Amino acid sequence: KGNFTWATVDINVLNQYIQELRVHKGYRDTTTARKVASIKSFFGFLSENSIIAEDPTDSLGSPRVGRTLPKFLSEEDVTTLLNTAYKSGSNEGQRDAVIMELLYATGLRVGELVSLNLQDVDQSEAYIKCMGKGSKERIVYLHSKALDELRRYLRESRIALLGHRRTEQALFVNHRGERLTRQWVWTILKTYAQRAGIDPNITPHTLRHSFATHLLQNGASLRHVQELLGHSSISTTQVYTHLTNGYVKQEYAKSHPRA
C-alpha cells in the first residue's frame, strides 16, 4: 500500500502478522513457526544484500513447539569432513576448512561466524569475541589445531582472496574479497559433506550441535557448555544431556576431542 518498501516493515508489523495467523486464521503453532522461519530467512537475505539497513526479525519470537533432539555428527564424521576440505589444496578450500574447523571448535552460530572481523580474534590468547543473540558479547576459545589453521589462513589464503581489497576487515571473504554470507557457508557445508560421503543435509548448526554434544560426552559441565554456546537459559542447553554420560571437567582443552 502507498509508499510500502521492505524497509518500512518493523517488529510491530511482524508481530501483528503473527497474531493474525494465530488468532484470526487459526493456524497451529507448528504452521506459524514454519512461517516465522521463512520470514526470518527472507529478511536475513534482504539484510545481507544491503536491501534493508537492519533485520527486523532479530527479535521476532516464534511459537514454542515440541523440541526435537539436536542432529549431530560423530567425531569420526567430523574428522572426515574436515580432512576432505583440507585436502582440496585451493585458497577457497583452505578457507572452507578453517570455517568448518571454527564452527566445530567454538560452537559459533553461522550468523556470528560471518559477522567476525579481524579485530575479534585474539591470537595470543587463543580466543574470539563474538556478538550473539540479543547483542550479547561472549568469548569462545580456540584449541591449538584450530588456531594454527586460522593463522595459516590469515597468512596465505585470505590475502590471496582479498586481491586489491586489502582494507576489508571481514575475517572470512569470498573470491572477490567480500564478506561471506550465511547462505555461502550453508553451501560450503553441503558441498564438502557430499564429497566426504556423509549426510549431505547437514547445516552449520549441525556442527554447533556436534560441538556441544561432544564436549558433554567428554566430560564438560553443562554450565560450561551453556556459556560457550551463549544460551541465556540452561534449559536450552539441557536438550543435549540425553546423549551425555561423562565426568565433569573444567578445562575446555581437556574436553574437546580435537584439542
Ranges and model annotations:
Residues K1-A259:
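Conserved catalytic core of the tyrosine transesterase superfamily
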